């Protein structure tokens, strides 16, 4: 699977490089399938209880993967309208976890997604589904101009979204 790196928004909690409290993750998309993937190794800062990753961190990473899957598919930035996460097994601190997300179906005003998070032994940590709402064209332009930190990145996103499946 050949992938493309997805752009970063400077202050984003998940991918932002300028957020001192952020996760600084690198998300990628397979341009042929629209499947988004991300790897994350939680640190002791992400503990919820006795060496287990906090469920909110798991949900946050899953949401980021699903919103990018919806954005790639819908060719516009999307916002989460609803997300359901089913936690199956605990994620352990300092052990890599992998998340993939894809689109189930897409309509002009609603994109349905799913995601799976697994550990390095392929054990399911969480499964999720979400409903994402694409921004209208004007708000999408404003969003792109506001959150992206430079013209080159803005042009990269515009080209990526034009090429999206």
Where are the regions that the model predicts?
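Hydrophobic beta-strand-centered segment that forms part of the acyl-chain substrate-binding groove
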Residues: 65-98
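A generic structural signal for short beta-strands and their flanking turns/coil linkers
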Residues: 8, 21-23, 34-36, 79-83, ...
């Amino acid at each position: 699977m050949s992938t493309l790196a997805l752009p970063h928004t400077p202050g984003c909690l998940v991918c932002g490089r300028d957020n001192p409290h952020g996760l600084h993750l690198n998300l990628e998309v397979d341009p042929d399938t629209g499947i988004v993937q991300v790897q994350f190794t939680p640190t002791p800062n992400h503990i919820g209880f006795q060496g287990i990753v906090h469920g909110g961190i798991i949900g946050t990473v899953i949401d980021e993967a699903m919103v990018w899957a919806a954005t790639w598919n819908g060719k516009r930035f999307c916002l989460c309208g609803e997300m359901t996460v089913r936690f199956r097994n605990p994620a352990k601190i300092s052990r890599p976890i992998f998340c993939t997300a894809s689109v189930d179906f897409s309509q002009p005003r609603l994109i349905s997604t799913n995601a799976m998070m697994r550990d390095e032994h392929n054990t399911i940590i969480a499964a999720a589904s979400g409903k994402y709402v694409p921004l209208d064209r004007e708000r999408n332009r404003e969003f792109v101009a506001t959150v992206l930190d430079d013209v080159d990145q803005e042009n990269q996103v515009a080209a990526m979204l034009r090429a999206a499946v």
